[in-house]
């Protein structure tokens, strides 16, 4: 079972992030924040230690942290997101992950 999770609080720029369903309209930022808080509570209820990163307005999709790193018990692999709006985001997670790996 997982013991640790790293999450990033959605930034207000989330509403201009990448979407595969534009017909649904822009995300509701306040609802996204509530869902994020609920997600954290659910993880904590499962006895997961949650590291919460601050929002980063430069990267609208940065709350989807799983897109920039694949983690295993032995190592973390930093990915290279294809979208131009995500370039540079991977640099921000490298330092955070270093705290979890030798």
Give names to the regions the model predicted:
Residues 1-102:
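The feature marks the mature, well-folded catalytic cores of soluble enzymes
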């Amino acid at each position: 079972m997982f013991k640790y999770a790293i999450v990033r609080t959605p930034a207000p720029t989330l509403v201009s992030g990448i979407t595969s369903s534009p017909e649904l309209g822009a995300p509701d930022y306040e609802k996204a924040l509530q869902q994020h808080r609920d997600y954290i509570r659910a993880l904590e209820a499962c006895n997961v230690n949650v590291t919460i990163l601050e929002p980063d307005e430069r990267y609208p999709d940065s709350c989807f942290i799983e897109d920039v790193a694949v983690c295993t018990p032995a190592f973390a692999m930093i990915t290279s997101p294809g979208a131009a709006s995500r370039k540079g985001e991977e640099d921000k997670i490298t330092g955070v992950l270093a705290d979890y790996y030798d």
